[in-house]
C-alpha cells in the first residue's frame, strides 16, 4: 500500500466536505458539513476494520484491538471541525494521518 497516495486521497476527499468556493473550508460544529465529515471518517475507519462509536456529544472514537494486549488502549486525538474559511489541513490532517497509519 502506498501510504502517501492513500493519505493524499483521504485529505482531498475529506477537504471536499465543507469546501468553500471563496477559499478554505467551513465545517462548524454540529452543522450538516461537520456531520457528513464525521460519517466519512467513520466509514473509512470501519472499512479498515476498526471499531467505531460516537459519544453523547458527537466525538467519534475508533479502536483497533492490540494483538499482545487487546484490553489496553492508547488514545490519540484530533478534530475535523473548522473555523469559517479554515485551512484544509487544520485538524483533519491528524485524523487522516493516524487512521491511514493504523491501516498499514
Regions found by a protein language model. Name each.
Residues 8, 31-39, 54-56, 70, ...:
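Generic alpha-helical scaffold signal
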Residues 44, 48, 60-93, 98:
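Catalytic-core environment of secreted peptidases
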Residues 19-65:
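A non-catalytic alpha/beta surface segment that caps or lines the substrate-entry region
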Residues 11, 22-25, 57, 77-80, ...:
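Generic secondary-structure boundary/loop-capping signal
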Residues 4-7, 18-20, 50, 70-73, ...:
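Homeobox/homeodomain signature
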Residues 1-31:
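N-terminal capping segment at the start of a domain
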Residues 100-104:
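Conserved small/polar residues in nucleotide/adenosyl-binding loops
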Residues 9, 13-14, 40-44, 97:
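Alpha-helical scaffold segments in soluble metabolic enzymes
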Amino acid at each position: 500500500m502506498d501510504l502517501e497516495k492513500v493519505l493524499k486521497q483521504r485529505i482531498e476527499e475529506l477537504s471536499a466536505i465543507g469546501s468553500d468556493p471563496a477559499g478554505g473550508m467551513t465545517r462548524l460544529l454540529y452543522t450538516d458539513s461537520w456531520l457528513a465529515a464525521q460519517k466519512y471518517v467513520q466509514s473509512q475507519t470501519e472499512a479498515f476494520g476498526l471499531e467505531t462509536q460516537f459519544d453523547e456529544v458527537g466525538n467519534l472514537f475508533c479502536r483497533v484491538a492490540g494483538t499482545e494486549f487487546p484490553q489496553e488502549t492508547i488514545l490519540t486525538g484530533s478534530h475535523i471541525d473548522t473555523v469559517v474559511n479554515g485551512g484544509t489541513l487544520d485538524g483533519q490532517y491528524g485524523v487522516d494521518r493516524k487512521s491511514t497509519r493504523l491501516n498499514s
